[in-house]
From Swiss-Prot:
Primary gene name: DEFB2
Keywords of the record: Antibiotic, Antimicrobial, Defensin, Disulfide bond, Secreted
Taxon lineage: Eukaryota, Metazoa, Chordata, Craniata, Vertebrata
An MF annotation (GO) of this entry: CCR6 chemokine receptor binding
Keyword Cell inner membrane: no
Tissue specificity as recorded in UniProt: Neutrophilic granules.
Disulphide bridges: C7-C36, C14-C29, C19-C37
Species of origin: Bos taurus
GO cellular component: extracellular space
A Pfam family per the record: Defensin_beta
Keyword Secreted belongs to the record: yes
Protein's name in the database: Beta-defensin 2
Length: 40
């Protein structure tokens, strides 16, 4: 996952920090600083 569109398609969301709680990073959104997270 390398942008916010594919992040959304994969049921993820973008955060500028570490992925919260039980979510896991599945890629990035707008560069390496913004992470795409998804709950499992």
């Amino acid at each position: 996952v390398r942008n916010h569109v594919t992040c959304r398609i994969n049921r993820g969301f973008c955060v500028p920090i570490r992925c919260p709680g039980r979510t896991r990073q599945i890629g990035t959104c707008f560069g390496p600083r913004i992470k795409c997270c998804r709950s499992w």
